[in-house]
UniProtKB/Swiss-Prot annotation:
Forms a heterodimer with SLX4. Coiled coil: none annotated. Keywords: DNA damage, DNA recombination, DNA repair, Endonuclease, Hydrolase, Metal-binding, Nuclease, Nucleus, Zinc, Zinc-finger. It comes from the Eukaryota. One of its GO terms (biological process) is DNA-templated DNA replication. The keyword Signal does not apply. GO terms for cellular component: Slx1-Slx4 complex. Transmembrane segments: none annotated. This is Structure-specific endonuclease subunit SLX1.
Length: 312
């Protein structure tokens, strides 16, 4: 059976800030922020970046992360644009808060570039999440020193902003014990976000799988029976669900795509991604990338299960 490229369970672009040298920053990307942070801080011998090994900068605090990228390539594009805000094509020249290669060293510049990139039409429709592990950093972002959120055009904000429960605030780095305490607490916050995100996706996937495996479901649009069919073509085995797992909406992915595109506000030639689609049953706002993620993931899991049955 034909296969689609898997959307990663997690992929994010993060901002590190040195706990001991608060004016030192690092931007990177990873599918596993916990492992990556340990690498940067030297807890794991392999990995890490040369710049984060410089004397006096370790340990690092992960203060923010943008996650939910549909592919590694998309995350790397965001990372490169964030690192090169003075020349990236994803920020219009007149909107750049960083003008030169050596500019943009402050945290205000780093955070402003996040907003600029999230407002770009390429990243907007990925329905990304900007998460803060440090409340003080979130406040700096909200303060918006360069007025990026007001001065740069955008139809709407398709991204979510969140803050860790018990997020760090003012950093006390007077002693080694203080620094290590911040390091430990930050690692716990990163671990919690990563594990919770994966656990929620696993739970949701199981609920969707149960809907398909039990009872008789028909497509909301074409009224054909929804059922995994190993001998069928790929379009018959990709399904769309509502993000509200209590909603009974289910359809073929292709049918949902046609419906959402027919209701999009922009001309068809301007976009190939449904904009802010709403469930036709309960009107919950859907994240199209999540709809695709669960559709492909469910198909792959069902195909794998069928293959195992054949070998028994």
């Amino acid at each position: 059976m034909e296969e689609f490229q898997q959307i990663p369970d997690f992929y994010g672009c993060y901002l590190l800030q040195s706990i001991s040298k608060r004016q030192s920053f690092y931007i990177g990307s990873t599918p596993n922020p916990v492992r990556r942070l340990r690498q940067h801080n030297g807890s794991l011998s392999r990995g890490g970046a040369y710049r984060t090994k410089r004397d006096g900068t370790r340990p690092w605090e992960m203060v923010a992360i943008v996650y939910g990228f549909p592919s590694r390539i998309a995350a790397l594009q965001f990372e490169h644009a964030w690192q090169h805000g003075y020349q990236t094509r994803y920020i219009k020249s007149q909107d750049r808060v960083v003008k030169t290669r050596k500019g943009g060293r402050s945290i205000h510049h780093k955070l402003a570039m996040i907003t600029s990139l999230l407002k770009n039409e390429y990243f907007r429709y990925m329905d990304l999440t900007l998460h803060f592990f440090n409340q003080k950093v979130e406040e700096i972002w909200k303060n918006d020193k360069f007025n990026v959120s007001q001065t740069q055009e955008s139809i709407d904000n398709n991204y979510t902003v969140s803050l860790s429960q018990d997020a760090l605030t003012e950093i006390n780095n007077d002693t080694i014990d203080d620094i290590m305490d911040v390091n430990e607490k930050n690692m716990e916050l990163v671990q919690n976000l990563y594990s919770t995100t994966l656990a929620e996706k696993t739970k949701t996937l199981l609920l969707y799988k149960e809907k398909i495996d039990t009872g008789i479901n028909t497509c909301q649009f074409c009224n054909k029976i929804i059922k995994h069919n190993l001998s069928g073509n790929i379009s018959e085995n990709l399904f769309a669900f509502c993000r509200d797992t209590s909603c009974t909406f289910v359809s073929h992915l292709a049918c949902a795509y046609r419906y959402f595109m027919s209701n999009t506000e922009l001309p068809k030639e301007d976009t190939i991604i449904p904009q802010s689609p709403k469930c036709p049953k309960c009107y919950t706002l859907l994240k199209w990338c999540d709809v695709i993620y669960y559709s492909i993931k469910l198909n792959k899991d069902n195909t794998t299960a069928d293959d195992k049955k054949k070998t028994i």
